[in-house]
Design a protein with these regions (language model features):
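Bacterial Sec-dependent N-terminal signal peptides
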Residues: 1-23
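Extended hydrophobic/Leu-rich segments
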Residues: 6, 346-347
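Glycoside hydrolase catalytic-domain context in secreted enzymes
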Residues: 15-346
Length: 348
């Protein structure tokens, strides 16, 4: 199915064919020059597609957004026919025909179910873990999925934390090696049977106080870099296509809007050049942390280094107005859009 959707995009739009024959940065430069501000912001917009799974594609608001270039990615759409139909809208009906990313949580297998990640880590069998990710990628890509929210490389020491089973335990060395293996398994050589990995949750999500999910984190920089950051650094160096920021606060600032975390460390120190997506609704949840209204949260998230908004609808609702008000520069929108386009076009 993935091959048929990609062939569809090539047949319908020579623009995407060019992406395979000229340097990606040149292609994206040309594409950005053709995009309106609203279309650029649309590429930063990730929305849920559960209504499509249970209903008709063309009756979903997502179809209208895709047709008007206001949508960059969708999560939780299941079914070959459903994904193909929405992808056809994006490549046939939108002005520029940019295809969509289709994301899914693929934690320990897709159709073939493997042991939970914590159990897999007990094996220390990196070859088997990589093979499991490769099988999951093959199965997911056959259904039209091209982006998976995995691996989760959060170091977790407190068994009270409810998501400890999704990670690799407390050892930063082992967690780093497993993250690398899963990225290799998922992404491979960017072929038809591969998917883009999304490393999560950056960062310190597994260190929530008292093991309470979403809770605050307060620790020294030394402990961060020695114990909690190594798997993320290893994943960045392994070429993971995307990172997902965490819900928790770091040094009193929500991770989604924390420039030190997202830019100073991930971008500048580790030289990561993939794109950053929020966790589900995280920009909207920043309001509860006292950052202001939804527009203020969007501006802070973008300034911090966030590239894609997952399901807050915050970028879509507020960034154009923020540009007009001088709160956000068009160059910031372009930078985020470029990151999303460069990585998504490789993996679609």
């Amino acid at each position: 199915m993935k091959k048929s959707v990609f062939s569809l995009s090539l047949a319908c739009l020579s623009l995407l064919a060019t992406a395979r024959t000229e340097p990606m940065n040149t292609f994206v430069d040309n594409l950005l020059s053709k995009m309106t501000l609203e279309e650029k912001i649309g590429q930063l917009n990730l929305l849920p597609g559960g209504d499509i799974t249970t209903g008709a594609v063309m009756k979903s608001p997502l179809a209208d957004l895709a047709a008007n270039g206001r949508l960059g990615a969708v999560l939780n759409v299941k079914g070959v026919d459903k994904i193909r139909a929405l992808q056809e809208v994006a490549v046939k009906k939108s002005r520029l025909g940019i295809p969509l990313l289709f994301g899914q949580d693929v934690i320990h297998g897709y159709q073939t179910v493997f042991p939970i990640p914590l159990a897999q880590s007990c094996s220390w069998d990196l070859e088997a873990i990589e093979q499991g990710a490769r099988i999951a990628a093959r199965e997911a890509s056959a259904q039209g999925i091209n982006w998976v929210y995995s691996p989760m490389v959060d170091i977790a020491l407190d068994p009270r934390w409810g998501r400890i089973a999704e990670g690799n335990g407390e050892d930063p060395f082992l967690g780093s090696r497993i993250g690398e293996a899963m990225i290799r398994g998922f992404q491979g050589n960017y072929g038809r049977e591969n998917v883009m990995a999304c490393v999560k949750h950056y960062a310190l999500y597994g260190a929530a106080e008292a093991g309470r999910d979403y809770n605050t984190v307060d620790m020294s920089r030394q402990r961060m870099f020695n114990q909690y950051f190594p798997p993320f650094k290893a994943a960045a160096e392994a070429g993971a296509g995307s990172f997902m920021s965490s819900f928790n606060v770091v040094d009193g600032i929500p991770a989604t809007g924390n420039r030190w975390l997202l830019t100073d460390v991930l971008r500048d120190r580790w030289h990561y050049d993939g794109f950053l997506v929020t966790d589900y609704g995280a920009i909207g949840e920043m309001v509860a942390h006292g950052v202001g209204d939804l527009k203020a949260a969007s501006v802070q998230a973008l300034h911090a280094g966030t590239d894609m908004d997952m399901c807050s609808d915050a970028f879509a609702k507020t960034l154009a107005e923020a540009v007009k008000a001088g709160k956000v520069g068009v160059e910031e929108i372009d930078r985020a859009c470029r990151r999303v386009l460069e990585l998504s076009l490789i993996h679609i």
